[in-house]
């Protein structure tokens, strides 16, 4: 038997009377929910469960990143960081000037004239943009002078353009010093310009002023090393390169320049140590740069250790297999080792270019694994003229009636005479090669 409370209906719903306060509360909740839903749909209200938006980076953070990468020796990464900073702050002349300086430094890590010129031209564009924004800033003017001076490279530009660039560099650095006579970088860059104007004694006085103003800049010691090199004071230059390295220990081009000075003094072990340090820095950064291996290869070749030289140039070719300059270096090593057949093949790739099969054979690559690489030959310039000369000499020496190579040799010699008619030493070498081919009726 079930107990049923009195008045409790069992088989129908009980209708309660409405509570006005309860109804008002529910309506308020519904209306509020509608507003929230609408806000979420239009983006006016953000859900607490949405991921937090990534904060926007400010230019200063990219500058700090660039400085850190520069100190680590990663010039490419530093340049990219400064470019990002400038994208956020395009009217900052100081950033553009610093980017111009980094871009100029990066040219020291390139091997062909075309690559170097392109890097320096880009640096010049950045310097020009900086000057437009701050025409009376001493540091911006100093960096413009530095960049213009590096662009005034006789191996890369005509004599007329070289003199014009030097003149503008001189004007910029003079103005920089007028604005701030204690600007150590301006004084150092002025000394560098004076060396390039063949005013070495004046350059020595100017770099002394830079050292007195502030010797904490890497560039002040770099330029002093350059001044000492121009005076053939290689021992003093080595000391200055070492000081520059103390201030910027991971810049590979400083280690390379130190090594070149050791090599000039035939201090080959010390030279190789400097070049090996550049290799080590690049490995730490994950950079595959052929330049230190070229320096090592040339050093071994000077010592007559051609096997070690060949091994290092092969490594360089692995890193940059389409670079014709590297085939020229390989040809020079084969030439010194009196391996004339291999020298001829390598020089052909450097001067005339070669197909994928020829480049693969020289690189000793695996055709089943390595990508095919064709090589475009170098034009005849100041930077490539010795490859042309040696190639012509090898062609003349290897001429046989059954395998005639003098026709190509004579083409090389004619091209050389047209391009460098006033280079007496080179023309004398050309004449010797022509004499060989003339005996065969060419």
Roles of regions detected by a PLM:
Residues 57-88, 105-116, 185, 189, ...:
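Alpha-helical segment of the N-proximal tetratricopeptide repeat
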Residues 59-60, 93-94, 138-142, 184-185, ...:
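Helix-start (N-cap) detector for alpha-helical repeat units in TPR-like alpha-solenoids
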Residues 67, 101, 105-108, 146, ...:
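Residue-level recognition of tetratricopeptide repeat
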Residues 71, 105-106, 150-151, 196, ...:
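Register position in tetratricopeptide repeats
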Residues 88, 133, 179, 213-214, ...:
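Structural marker of alpha-solenoid helical repeat scaffolds
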Residues 98, 143, 189, 223, ...:
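Canonical tetratricopeptide repeat
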């Amino acid at each position: 038997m079930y107990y049923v409370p009195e008045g409790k209906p069992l088989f129908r719903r009980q209708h309660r009377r409405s509570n006005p306060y309860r109804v008002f509360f529910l309506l308020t909740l519904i209306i509020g929910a509608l507003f929230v839903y609408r806000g979420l749909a239009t983006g006016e209200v953000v859900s607490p469960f949405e991921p937090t938006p990534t904060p926007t980076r400010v230019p200063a953070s990219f500058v700090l990143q660039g400085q850190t990468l520069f100190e680590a020796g990663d010039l490419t990464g530093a340049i990219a960081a400064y470019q990002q900073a400038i994208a956020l702050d395009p009217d900052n002349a100081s950033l553009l000037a610093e980017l111009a300086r980094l871009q100029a430094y990066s040219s020291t890590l390139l091997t062909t004239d075309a690559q170097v010129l392109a890097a320096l031209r880009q640096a010049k564009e950045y310097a020009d943009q900086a000057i437009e924004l701050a025409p009376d800033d001493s540091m911006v003017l100093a960096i413009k002078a530095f960049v213009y001076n590096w662009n005034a490279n006789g191996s890369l530009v005509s004599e007329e353009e070289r003199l014009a660039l030097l003149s503008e560099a001189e004007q910029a650095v003079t103005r920089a010093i007028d604005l701030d006579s204690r600007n150590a970088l301006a004084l150092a860059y002025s000394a560098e310009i004076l060396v390039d104007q063949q005013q070495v004694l004046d350059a020595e006085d100017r770099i002394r002023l830079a050292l007195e103003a502030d010797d904490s800049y890497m560039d002040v010691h770099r330029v002093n090393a350059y001044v000492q090199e121009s005076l053939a004071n290689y021992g003093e230059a080595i000391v200055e390169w070492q000081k520059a390295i103390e201030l910027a220990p991971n810049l590979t081009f400083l280690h390379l320049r130190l090594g070149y000075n050791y090599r000039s003094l035939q201090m080959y072990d010390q030279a190789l140590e400097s070049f090996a340090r550049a290799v080590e820095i690049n490995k730490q950064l994950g950079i595959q740069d052929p330049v230190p291996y070229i320096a090592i290869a040339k050093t071994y070749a000077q010592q007559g250790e051609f096997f070690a030289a060949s091994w290092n140039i092969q490594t360089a070719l692995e890193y940059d297999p389409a670079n014709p300059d590297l085939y020229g270096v390989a040809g020079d090593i084969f030439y010194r080792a009196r391996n004339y057949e291999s020298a001829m093949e390598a020089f052909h790739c450097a001067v005339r270019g070669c197909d994928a099969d020829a480049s693969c054979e020289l690189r000793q690559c695996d055709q089943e694994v390595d990508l095919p690489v064709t090589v475009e030959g170098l034009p005849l310039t100041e930077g490539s003229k010795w490859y042309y000369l040696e190639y012509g000499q090898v062609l003349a020496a290897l001429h046989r009636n059954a395998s005639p190579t003098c026709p190509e040799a004579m083409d090389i010699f004619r091209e050389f005479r047209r391009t460098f008619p006033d280079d007496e030493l080179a023309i004398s070498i050309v004449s010797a090669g022509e004499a060989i081919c003339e005996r065969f009726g060419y």
